[in-house]
Regions:
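Short, basic, alpha-helical segments at the C-terminal edge of helix-turn-helix-like DNA-binding modules
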Residues: 67-75
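All-alpha amphipathic helical-bundle segments outside canonical DNA-binding/catalytic cores
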Residues: 89-90, 126-127, 143-161, 178-182, ...
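Short linear capping/connector segments at secondary-structure termini
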Residues: 111-120
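A short secondary-structure junction motif
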Residues: 28, 73, 102-110, 138, ...
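Hydrophobic alpha-helical connector segments
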Residues: 65, 78-105, 156-160
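C-terminal peripheral helix-coil segments that are non-catalytic and often amphipathic
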Residues: 1-8, 133-144, 169, 174-200
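Helix-turn-helix
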Residues: 2, 16, 20, 24, ...
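Amphipathic alpha-helical packing segments from all-alpha helical-bundle domains
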Residues: 72, 119-144, 154-158, 166-169
Length: 200
């Protein structure tokens, strides 16, 4: 099976102006700015309230849609890095190095915006499933090509795909000697090195 995951697209009704507004909102969230209502955001961005409601029906959905778009753009960067290699295990290493940036300080500002939104769960679940499936496909390919040992690829995919989010937990963060991103990259390397076939 080829390593391919289809990313869902934004509504085809969104035009260039809507995407520009989402870029502006992304920039706002990136700087740690907030807004209390859709009207407040419209004033800050100096646009009509109608334009915002054409993108999403509520403040919560607008935040979820924007963060979803940020994660998909980051996912494309990870896919591009992965596709520079022909070896499945090299693809996996490249993908995870970029994917683990999603628990870095910049992305933490975005994910914090979702912490109190119940409507964000389907989107977060979608991205987790996307990453897990991609990792499993790459592990399966690596096993077929004898690049890795005989392992449970599903369990390993769940582990590798969930490291970043696990270490981003506030309960664990204070006890880490490194950032969640660096810790995730370190353990990713240990795990992948441990499952690689030994060179004769």
């Amino acid at each position: 099976m080829k390593s391919q995951v289809v990313l869902s697209k934004l509504s085809p009704q969104l035009g260039k102006r809507h995407l520009e507004v989402m870029d502006d909102l992304e920039s706002m969230l990136d700087k740690g700015k907030s807004f209390s209502t859709m009207s407040d955001l419209a004033k800050q961005l100096k646009i009509s309230l109608r334009t915002l409601y054409e993108i999403a029906p509520s403040k919560e959905e607008l935040i979820v849609t924007t963060v979803d778009r940020v994660l998909k753009k980051h996912g494309k960067i990870a896919m591009d890095a992965m596709n520079a290699h022909s070896s499945p295990i090299k693809k996996l290493e490249s993908f995870l190095t970029v994917a683990n940036q999603a628990v870095g300080p910049r992305f933490e500002r975005f994910t914090l915006s979702l912490s109190s939104l119940n409507s964000s769960k389907p989107m977060v679940d979608y991205h987790e499933q996307y990453i897990t499936e991609l990792i499993k496909n790459l592990l399966d390919e690596a096993r077929i090509k004898n690049e890795i040992k005989e392992i449970d690829t599903q369990a390993t995919a769940l582990l590798l795909g969930g490291l970043g989010r696990y270490f981003q937990s506030k309960k664990l963060f204070k006890d880490l000697h490194q950032t969640p991103e660096k810790t995730s990259n370190l353990l990713t390397k240990i795990i992948i090195d441990g499952i690689k076939m030994e060179k004769s």
